[in-house]
Amino acid sequence: MTVVVGVKQSPDSRAAIRLAAQEALYRDTTLIAVMAYPAERGWSPAVRPGAERLTRADDRTIAEDLLHQAVSDALGDAAERVEYRVVAVADLAGRALVHVAQTEDAQLLVLAARSGIAKVLGTVSQYVLRNAPCPVLTVPE
């Protein structure tokens, strides 16, 4: 059993990561931080015009590094108390989250939800709510 949290390439995921970590500690289970990235090669923001394109392995490594950094930034010193793994998936975000939740036997899936004017759930949240194999918790960004 695990707790899965969706992580975006923005600081907005911090609250979701913190809450997911609390849930993982409470449930005495592993936190799995998931980031989806485009299946096309060379998606990284590090790629500039004229720079060499990245391979798929490079893309995965960059996404995993971003995930580790996001968890570390969100949890600070508390990251040492939480057992966590990172999973980078070359797919659409909703499908990636549901797939990881299924394969990792998730007890809970945590997502950052839109706030402000965009309080309506986005397409990723809608997909996850319809297809997740476990309860879904949305956290305001």
Predicted regions and their residues:
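Small/aliphatic-rich secondary-structure junction motif
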Residues: 1-53, 76, 131
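Structural beta-alpha unit
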Residues: 12, 72-109
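General small-molecule cofactor/ligand-binding pocket signal
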Residues: 32-34, 85-89, 137-139
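Short secondary-structure boundary segments
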Residues: 35-36, 112-114, 140-141
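A short acidic, glycine-rich active-site loop
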Residues: 51-66
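Glycine-rich, Arg-bearing micro-motifs that act as flexible, cationic patches
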Residues: 108-131
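Short, acidic/small-residue loops that bind anionic groups at enzyme active sites
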Residues: 131-141
